[in-house]
Amino acid sequence: MATNGFRPEYEDLGRYEDILGQLPMLQVYSHIMLPFAMPEGLSRDTIIADLEAAVRQIRAHVPWMAGKVVNVGKGPDNSGRYIVVPCPPPDPLIVVRDVTHAFPPYKEIQRLKAPNSMLDSRLLAPTNAFPQRFEDSEEDPFRVIRLQASFVDGGVFLDFVTQHNMTDAGGLFGFARLVAMAMRGEQFSESLLEQVNRDRRNIIPLLTPDEPMLDHSHHIRPPITDAQPVVRPDPARWHFLRFTAAKLAELKDLASQTMTPDPEVPYITTDDAVSAFCWKKYITVRHRRRNTPDARSRFSRAMDGRKVLGIPAEYMGDLVHNVTTWLTFRELVDLPLGEIARHMRRELNRANTAYHVRSFATFIAQEPDKSTIAYGGRFNPDTDVGSSSVLRVDLFPVFGKLGRPDFIRRPNFPGIPFPSLLYFFPQNPQGDCDSLTCLTDADMEALNQDSEWTSMVEYIG
């Protein structure tokens, strides 16, 4: 019998092995960091106690989050299976650091809007991050969740970390929301636990023999190894940008006004418009250096498959598939913003379907060596852009006595750049969207000298 919504079958860790989480490229950690101002009169000890209580509540109700990930059955031409197994709890449950000596007062961090250059992962993060692979060991297990609280004068940074074979961005944000709920003193409802602990084994119906598989060959790349990572770390740096609510609306209006009528594209979204703007400007500044008008550029968008499969947002497993749009450098330079956004929305409308997700899952399931599969395939950071947007996700909940975070950030991992990657983070309560992008110095300098770019984008750093 269930107690407080918890069911005994949730303790069967075999139910959490899915298909989309089996890619070796996901043998990494994902991070999302939330900075808070310390409320008057609230002690560090109280915050630590509340965070530890929240993690205990999660571990008790979400068994797979209390485990670690291991790879079994790996061999020649076979990448093995990623499964979650029991693991003793860490002691202490969360990492706590006083980093006051290395940071200005939190009010100054607020004033500067928490630029990436300030967010040293060596101080603020408990472990490494994508695209750097993590290897499980007795000394440092590949835990499904980690949490670090880093205190500065007048503030605290909370770094939420999840194992990527077990969760996508929705699952990472779900972990943060569970902590917020627990810190508010809320119990996890039966319906929430049902989705968080949902059996993943058959959540995506694979194609039947009489259903043709779509072409996913663009996801094939050389096998991912330590010597051959997801992308070569060319000289590049991470930067935070801000699109204010007013500029987001302006970009959407501009794109809507310059779009040719298309029966396949009844509308475009703010996400389409801001993605098209970044793609156009990135390639425009590269074209000035390269002068290769016929070169093809690819914009790869990570899409959440939950909606098209009828799966609630609270489900935390990997359900990401990718939608790709191709245009030439000449087209990206010459076409108006609305036409680029129309192309992107058309490809998304065609591919963001249950059949596409089922086909992608079948493609993965049938390939013994999944190290040859990557979202970006043979990604070329000089011509392509890889993007993930969670612009519409709410990630500013109240974390009990701590209140709401001021920003959404990611610790800065300067030694592991991923050039031409672009994240759009959730909009803040004022409607502003902060974006994290990795670009070469040449790209960033050229963009900051582009008047159209600087009129739309606030550079945070």
From Swiss-Prot:
Pathway: Secondary metabolite biosynthesis. It is an enzyme of class 2 (transferase). GO terms for molecular function: acyltransferase activity. Transmembrane segments: none annotated. O-acetyltransferase; part of the gene cluster that mediates the biosynthesis of nigerpyrone and its derivatives carbonarone A and pestalamide A. The biosynthesis pathway begins with the polyketide assembly by epaA to form phenylacetyl triketide precursor from successive condensation of two malonyl-CoA, presumably with one phenylacetyl-CoA starter unit produced by the phenylacetyl-CoA ligase epaB. For the nigerpyrone biosynthesis, the reactive polyketide chain is released as an aldehyde through the R-domain. A nonenzymatic cyclization and dehydration may create nigerpyrone. Belongs to the trichothecene 3-O-acetyltransferase family. This is O-acetyltransferase epaC. It comes from Aspergillus niger (strain ATCC MYA-4892 / CBS 513.88 / FGSC A1513).
